A protein has these predicted regions:
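Binding-site signature for planar aromatic cofactors or substrates
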Residues: 1-199
Length: 199
């Protein structure tokens, strides 16, 4: 589950508090602290969601992995008996916890430095906060509120055609590889890997 969370670090944060139901989408950094890990993230100070999170209620973060439509036309079993229907393949992780508000400048600077390094790691010349004037970074930090989200439970769901016969899964791999749109190639790799593991 951590592998998906690291590969797809842009998560949906959902909470319900005295102001009602909120949802925000934000980049994350996953740490290996504690039994399930800790997620560090931030919101714009102008986003009212952060004050709701400060109440300390349980919240949910959703990490969406590869997903896509699967046509039954890819199943060889369609020609044999016709008992096939379309479906949707997907991978998702739900992380639950109680966010802790982090407002200290040192914490925020460390967080945005780590987040930037995580996202810039494959660049020829990675950008870092130290590339900008200190006074500018200080102003930018005043515009965000950080959160430390200690995960209390994790739930993952992977539906990658594992319920189909091997020949149908091979058909899915071929179909996804030929369509090659969105997450298709990543899904084809996952389905193919699971065929190999099950043999």
């Amino acid at each position: 589950m951590h592998a998906l969370m690291r590969a797809r670090p842009f998560a949906a944060l959902i909470s319900a508090g005295s102001a009602g139901l909120y949802a925000s989408h934000l980049p994350t950094v996953l740490k290996d602290d504690g039994p399930y890990g800790v997620i560090e993230c931030h919101l714009a100070r102008a986003n009212p969601h952060w004050s709701d999170l400060a109440e300390g209620n349980e919240a949910l973060m959703i990490f969406q992995g590869p997903e896509g439509y699967i046509t039954p036309n890819w199943y060889p079993s369609k020609a044999l008996h016709g008992k096939v229907v379309p479906t949707w393949n997907f991978a998702v992780v739900h992380a639950y916890g109680r966010p802790e508000v982090m407002r200290e400048n040192d914490w925020l600077l460390r967080h945005v430095t780590e987040l930037t390094a995580q996202q810039e790691r494959n660049g020829a010349k990675p950008w870092a906060p130290t590339d900008a004037p200190d006074t500018y970074i200080e102003v930018m930090l005043r515009g965000i509120v950080g959160f430390r989200f200690a995960i209390t439970r994790l739930k993952g769901k992977w539906k990658m055609s594992q319920n189909r016969e091997v020949q149908d899964r091979v058909g899915v791999v071929k179909g996804l590889s030929a369509r090659a749109a969105g997450d298709d190639l990543e899904m084809a790799e996952i389905v193919s890997r699971r065929i190999t593991q099950s043999n």
